[in-house]
A protein has these predicted regions:
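Signature of the first transmembrane helix
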Residues: 20-81, 85, 249-269
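Small-residue hotspots at the loop-to-helix junctions and early N-terminal turns
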Residues: 51-64, 139, 143, 202, ...
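Small-residue-rich hydrophobic transmembrane alpha-helices
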Residues: 56-116, 153-172, 279-343
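Short membrane-interface helical motifs at transmembrane helix boundaries
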Residues: 113-144, 334-357, 361
Length: 373
């Protein structure tokens, strides 16, 4: 193993305790996902406490649309991570380099396309979801600004996925922590000092996302390893892209279909007015945090399986999958019990409006029954 691999503490999961590898690799991923989730959640916290329930409903009404697209590309990034971790595990440096270049090139192209399309269709998507007239202008404003900077989110997710695939979970976590703190500061600054409302939290989010993306690209560019990003070599290798899509597309479609169903539910929630929308928004934010441990275990298992398949140890890869499923089940049941008891206190973090609290607690407790699935 090279000097830089030792310095970055790259994790070779092809030997040693499976449980220990998964837990130790999951912890930094969990914190990273926590910081990632803070972006939109902080937006809701700030507008809910400093602007009003209509602004909270506006931000919340966009979540399912954003997630539908972002989760699709997150699924594709899982495919890229599996391919890269396989080449890393098999020490195929040439293929590793090509996989990195292909991943980044595709990300840039998708970011540009998604930005253009998203800004244009954002108002129409919200109208299709029957967003109330008193919320629609704020929702459209937030969503269009968000789409304007979505490339930063995609680049960070793909770039940090590359680093995690070769065992570097520390720096993506540090970068995301830095940008999350930046987002909180900018949220409060734009909303309280400049009274920018919903637009302020949207701008704070995309500025912070571009900061984290720039840091990840800098690390990949400055690396001396074969996963280094060489701009002049940036291209799409068709065979590698096919491998990425064969794994990533099913994962992306699965995740985006779930988000699509949430968007469908959101359209019915919108019929009941801004208080119900705000209560649903509070529930979804909490639900997204609750799912983070299981999501992080899944990401750790992806890298574990990828490296062991690259090392041609299928039996160990299967054992790792079973261990990950067991850990996820235990954690989900524990968190469901805690949230059932403390549901009102968690909803009150976002809003103290009695109607919002009533709806939020109802949604949270109903959905806890299905968390383990």
């Amino acid at each position: 193993m090279s000097h830089e691999h030792k310095k970055l503490k790259a994790v070779d999961m092809t030997s040693g305790s499976i449980v220990r590898h998964l837990i130790m690799f999951t912890i930094p991923l969990l914190f990273g996902n926590l910081f990632q989730q803070l972006y939109n959640t902080v937006d809701s916290l700030v507008v809910g406490n400093f602007v009003g329930s209509e602004a909270l409903a506006a931000v919340g009404s966009t979540t399912s649309i954003v997630n539908m697209l972002v989760l699709f590309f997150n699924g594709v990034s899982i495919g890229a991570g599996v391919v890269i971790s396989r080449y890393f595990g098999s020490h195929n440096d040439e293929k590793l380099h090509l996989a990195v270049e292909t991943t980044i090139a595709v990300t840039f192209i998708c970011g540009v396309i998604l930005t253009g399309i998203g800004i244009y269709i954002a108002p129409f998507m919200l109208e299709l979801m029957d967003t109330p007239d008193d919320v629609l202008p704020l929702s459209s404003e937030y969503l269009q600004i968000y789409f304007g900077g979505i490339s930063g989110l995609l680049v960070y997710n793909m770039g940090s996925g590359i680093l995690r695939s070769v065992g570097d979970t520390r720096r993506p976590l540090l970068f995301l922590g830095f940008s999350s703190i930046m987002n909180i500061i900018l949220d409060l600054w734009f909303v309280i000092s400049f009274h920018m409302g919903v637009a302020g939290v949207a701008w704070a989010t995309i500025i912070s996302q571009f900061a984290s993306a720039a840091l990840v690209l800098l690390v990949l560019t400055k690396s001396t390893e074969n996963y280094r990003l060489v701009w002049k070599d940036l291209r799409i290798e068709k065979k590698i892209l096919k491998q990425i899509l064969m794994i990533g597309l099913p994962s992306g479609l699965q995740q985006s279909i779930t988000a699509f169903s949430n968007a469908y539910v959101q359209s019915y929630i919108n019929y009941f007015g801004s208080s119900c929308m705000a209560g649903w928004s509070c529930y979804t934010k909490i639900d997204q945090f609750v799912m983070l441990p299981m999501q992080s275990i899944g990401q750790a298992a992806t890298t574990f399986v990828g490296q062991n398949l690259g090392a041609r140890d299928v039996k160990r890869a299967r054992k790792g999958t079973n261990v990950a499923l067991g850990l996820s089940t235990i954690i989900s049941l524990t968190m469901a019990a805690i949230l059932w008891i403390l549901a009102p206190q968690f909803i009150q973090l976002f809003s103290r409006d009695p109607k919002v609290l009533e709806y939020g607690v109802l949604f949270l407790r109903l959905c806890l029954f299905f968390m383990v699935f």
